[in-house]
Amino acid sequence: MNRETALVVFSGGQDSTTCLFWAKRNFKKVYALSFLYGQKHQKEVELAREIARKAEVEFDVMDVSFIGTLGHNSLTDTTMVMDQEKPAGSVPNTFVPGRNLFFLSIAAVYARERGINHLVTGVSQTDFSGYPDCRDAFIKSLNVTLNLAMDEQFVIHTPLMWIDKAETWALADELGVLDLIRNETLTCYNGIQGDGCGHCPACTLRREGLEKYLKKKNQ
């Protein structure tokens, strides 16, 4: 397996784009893999393709649309009203059950066929919005499972696991891509590029993080 190459699970959003450039700094060769999972806003994949082109990394897309049909969630179901806050005692309906499990499992198979053992994902337990598949315990467990399942030595890297959105913006700035991430990524649950709609949960988290980082930077 090639220890100088990494595969980034890449959506074209703030977190995965930060991880893409983090991977470029830490590995000699980087691949980016995006997924069509039945999301309402498939524009994100085209933006991901363009960002990967600018980053000069190899880009691929896998169609896993069946994931969106397995359970109800507001990111794939056009009839569902999006939760604006995390409901008490349950995950928000923006949670796509099994998404990170499927993405990382498929990414591992994709990586294995190319001799890659480093996988990079932008999950964060600090700002995980209540999603169970963004927790460190899940990632560590899946890492062990993938290695046992394929008799390989995969390493799942989570550069954002223990940092909040303000610190994620700080990392983007350190990597020299703050403006690119602010203007060219798509994090908004309503499918609006850049600063987004400004009021969905993803935009709120992103905006508050940026404001906190810029305030600290300008002190």
Swiss-Prot record:
GO terms for molecular function: ATP binding; ligase activity, forming carbon-nitrogen bonds; zinc ion binding. Binds 1 zinc ion per subunit. Zn(2+) binds at C188, C197, C200, C203. Keywords: ATP-binding, Ligase, Metal-binding, Nucleotide-binding, Queuosine biosynthesis, Zinc. Gene3D superfamilies: HUPs (3.40.50.620). It catalyses: 7-carboxy-7-deazaguanine + NH4(+) + ATP = 7-cyano-7-deazaguanine + ADP + phosphate + H2O + H(+). Its cofactor is Zn(2+). This is 7-cyano-7-deazaguanine synthase. It comes from Bacteroides thetaiotaomicron (strain ATCC 29148 / DSM 2079 / JCM 5827 / CCUG 10774 / NCTC 10582 / VPI-5482 / E50).
